[in-house]
């Protein structure tokens, strides 16, 4: 049996959706702030819903938007997914904005939710935040592939990599062909390098067959389709039963 953890992308900014994912027994949810207009006000109730259902929450932020790191971390979200990592400088940028000194230079405010609005011991808050917070660094292009060895060398302890197959396929001149042998081979190369270095790596798929393929490959975590896609497919299949 695979030990892969399975999560779903959340595009619909309603806490009930987060709770439903938790009730379904999935391992985590990924709130997508990159490909949706979701902002910090919409994120807050989603964070509360995830905590209520003891569901791990990942937030994917837009590319190189400094304020998003602060907004998400200050709401007490431990896992941030950063897209379009192509160079060591991109890794260093993500680390800088995700952690407090001495690891990074994240903006420090004690009067935020993550610090109990000023009621956590400040030294304990800083140390515990650095220990608890994690990064998921998203590789999704040929430039990132070309620099993968140096990127892996720069990955901080506790961070992981994620392979975005759709953007990777596009960068290879095969837009949308995420099962093309060249795309899969490129993904496998990253996976093998991560395994050698004992770095967790995840990927995305949008079919049950894809989940089976990558889970059998031993991928530590798989991000699947989206909440709305699941609903539409389930509703469509229901309609087919009465035709």
What is the predicted role of each segment?
Residues 29-30, 58, 81, 162, ...:
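Conserved beta-strand positions in the central sheet of alpha/beta enzyme cores
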Residues 40-74, 98-105, 127-131, 179-202, ...:
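Alpha-helix-loop-beta-strand connector modules within alpha/beta enzyme cores
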Residues 19, 23, 59, 64-78, ...:
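Catalytic cores of alpha/beta
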Residues 79-93, 161-170, 219-238:
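Glycine-rich phosphate-binding active-site loops on the catalytic face of alpha/beta enzymes
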Residues 46, 50, 88-104, 215, ...:
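C-terminal helical cap(s) of enzyme catalytic domains, especially alpha/beta-barrels
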Residues 2-15, 58-60, 134-147, 200-206:
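Active-site mouth loops of central-metabolism enzymes
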Residues 67, 79-156, 165-167:
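Conserved anion-binding
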Residues 1-64, 96, 153-159:
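Conserved N-terminal beta1-alpha1 strand-loop-helix module at the mouth
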């Amino acid at each position: 049996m695979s030990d892969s953890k399975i999560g779903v992308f959340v595009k619909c900014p309603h806490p009930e959706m987060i709770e439903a994912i938790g009730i379904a027994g999935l391992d985590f949810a990924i709130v997508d702030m990159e490909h949706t207009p979701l902002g910090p006000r919409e994120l807050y109730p989603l964070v509360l819903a995830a905590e209520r259902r003891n569901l791990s929450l990942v937030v994917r932020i837009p590319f190189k938007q400094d304020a998003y790191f602060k907004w998400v971390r200050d709401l007490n979200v431990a896992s941030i997914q950063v897209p379009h990592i192509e160079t060591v400088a991109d890794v260093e940028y993500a680390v800088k904005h995700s952690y407090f000194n001495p690891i990074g230079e994240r903006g420090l405010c004690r009067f935020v939710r993550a610090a109990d609005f000023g009621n956590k011991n400040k030294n304990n808050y800083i140390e515990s935040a650095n220990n608890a917070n994690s990064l998921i660094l998203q590789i999704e292009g040929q430039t990132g592939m070309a620099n993968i060895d140096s990127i892996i060398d720069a990955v901080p302890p506790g961070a992981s990599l994620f392979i975005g197959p759709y953007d990777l396929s596009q960068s290879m001149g095969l837009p949308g062909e995420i099962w093309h042998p060249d795309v899969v081979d490129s993904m496998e190369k990253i996976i093998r390098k991560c395994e050698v270095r004992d770095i967790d790596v995840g990927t995305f798929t949008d079919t049950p067959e894809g989940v089976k393929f990558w889970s059998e490959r031993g991928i530590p975590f798989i991000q699947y389709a989206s909440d709305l896609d699941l609903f539409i497919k389930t509703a469509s299949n229901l309609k087919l039963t009465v035709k």
